[in-house]
From Swiss-Prot:
Family: Belongs to the CobB/CobQ family. CobQ subfamily.
Name used for this protein in its record: Cobyric acid synthase
PANTHER family, per database record: COBYRIC ACID SYNTHASE, DETHIOBIOTIN SYNTHETASE
Pathway annotation from the record: Cofactor biosynthesis; adenosylcobalamin biosynthesis
Length: 488
């Protein structure tokens, strides 16, 4: 089991790389995260949803994503509450205290999934959540040491040296553990190191002497990896680096407080002719394309946009010929009204949308979870492959001019319409996530938004190359023989 001294220490990445190495060695390997808290999720082959990191790890392992890989997923709806997803299906919304009482039920689901994976795979690589040293969460823990102790799983502790204080993180984490938990930690991995490894050696010697545990490796900081991020938005804007005379497309996405599935925009951030910005505050920069992203709390995030003046920004942008895309929750915001009669995302009630499309959305308790294929309603009808994750039912005249035609859900074939494309061709709305992942669709959308002579990129291929690069680095910098010996 891989546990971390902090959130974002590198647990997910370490599991992904180890999954790829196990696959290279011919093992049938599965990733497993007992409990995940994330707003970025993926649709599985068995029709549920799991954390995005586990979907990436499944890709690294060469297996189809399955709900057993992440049996408990918590999707925050507010600072104190979350939607609880068990075995891929939304069960209820709970605040933190109520979820604490529910944990024994959630733990049963965790153990069921783990047992199935142990029976079906040669190797299961487990990822913890956050840090095992959260004293206030120790009672009833199902994500870190509580799970490891229950199933007798050895632990490797990973720490991010790029943050600073790596030795304090490692030794301090051990100090917060019980004797049995501390004994369960077999050793350490230090992540994101830059510089001369020789200058780090005295610290590593001290760590070994202080703890009596080995350091299995020091992993270098790998720049330019294109791997799905699960929680944190990228810290910096992405500036285009183009050839002389090549076009540049400016794309701005508001960093909504409850933004979901921001992995939709990874292909744009990777595109050499896209200047990409997540807007958080201050003046909205000039843009060719504005994209309203998905949201786990659409009404609240819409109010946040209004408070920031984005309703005026969008209308001015359209007056000057700019293009706008709304994805999932962003699509719902573009309509006339948002109705939440059951209070699924907050207090029951209805709020006006931005009024740019003639349709209305009602939030319903049933969540749509589908992997989809189809074609964009743009020149050349480019192919699209993506997924739907939403609780909204949208209806209205604007849907008569759909943005996509998707393959029908049943065996009868045919197609079904999705989203809307405005009569003036400036607005596009869709429920489909992953819109830019397919090379042809990405190229067509960027051309529609105004990019002349755009380069076509294959984001899935770039992501696969990043996984390979990650595994190569691990093979070079980890003592795999010593690491594997602890787990046999």
């Amino acid at each position: 089991m891989i546990q971390g001294t902090t959130s974002d220490a590198g647990k997910s990445t370490l599991v992904a790389g180890l999954c790829r190495l196990a696959r290279r060695a011919g093992a049938r390997v599965a990733p497993f995260k007992p409990q995940n808290m994330a707003l970025n999720s993926a649709v599985t082959a068995d029709g549920g949803e799991i954390g995005r990191a586990q979907a990436l790890q499944a890709l690294a392992a060469g297996v189809a994503p399955h709900t057993d890989f992440n049996p408990v997923l918590l999707k925050p709806t507010s600072d104190r509450g979350a939607q609880v997803i068990i075995h891929g299906a939304a069960r209820m919304n709970l605040d933190a205290r109520a979820y604490h009482d529910y944990k024994p039920v959630a733990f049963d689901a965790v153990l069921e999934s783990y047992a199935r994976l142990r029976a079906g795979y040669d190797t299961v690589i487990v990822e913890g959540a956050g840090s095992p040293a959260e004293i206030n969460l120790r009672d009833g823990d199902i994500a870190n040491m509580g799970f490891a102790e229950r199933v007798d799983c050895p632990v490797v502790l990973v720490a991010d040296i790029d943050r600073g204080g790596v030795f304090a993180h490692l030794v301090g984490t051990l100090a917060c553990l019980s004797d049995s938990e501390r004994a369960r930690v077999r050793g350490f991995v230090i992540n994101r190191f830059r510089g001369d490894i020789g200058l780090l050696e005295p610290g590593l010697d001290w760590l070994r002497a202080q703890t009596g545990k080995p350091v299995f490796g020091v992993l270098p900081y790998l720049h330019g990896l294109l791997l799905d991020a699960e929680d944190m938005l990228p810290r910096q804007a992405r500036s285009a680096a183009t050839r002389d005379g090549a076009g540049v497309l400016r794309v701005v996405v508001p960093a909504l407080p409850r933004i979901s599935n921001h992995t939709d925009f990874d292909p744009l951030r990777a595109h050499p002719q896209v200047e990409f910005t997540y807007w958080k505050s201050g003046p909205v920069p000039a843009a060719d394309l504005l994209i309203l992203p998905g949201s786990k709390s659409v009404q609240r995030d819409l109010q946040w946009l209004r408070d920031a003046g984005w309703d005026t920004v969008i209308r001015r942008h359209l007056r000057y010929g700019g293009k706008v895309i709304g994805i999932c929750g962003g699509m719902q915001m573009l309509g006339r009204t948002l109705d939440d009669p059951l209070g699924l995302e907050g207090a029951p009630g209805s709020v006006p949308g931005l009024g740019l499309f003639d349709f209305d959305t009602t939030l319903l308790p049933h969540k749509t979870l589908k992997n989809v294929t189809g074609q964009l309603a743009l020149p050349g009808a480019p192919a699209v492959r993506g997924y739907e994750i939403h609780m909204g039912d949208t209806r209205g005249p604007a849907l008569a001019a759909p943005a996509l035609q998707l393959a029908a859900d049943d065996a009868a074939g045919g197609s079904r319409a999705d989203g809307a494309l405005s009569a003036d061709g400036q607005l596009l709305a869709t429920y489909v996530h992953g819109l830019f992942d397919t090379p042809a669709a990405c190229a067509a959308l960027l051309a529609w938004a105004g990019l002349d002579g755009g380069e076509r990129i294959d984001y899935p291929a770039l992501r696969e190359a990043s996984i390979e690069r990650l595994a190569d680095s691990f093979a070079e910098h980890l003592d795999l023989r010593a690491l594997y010996a602890e787990f046999r």
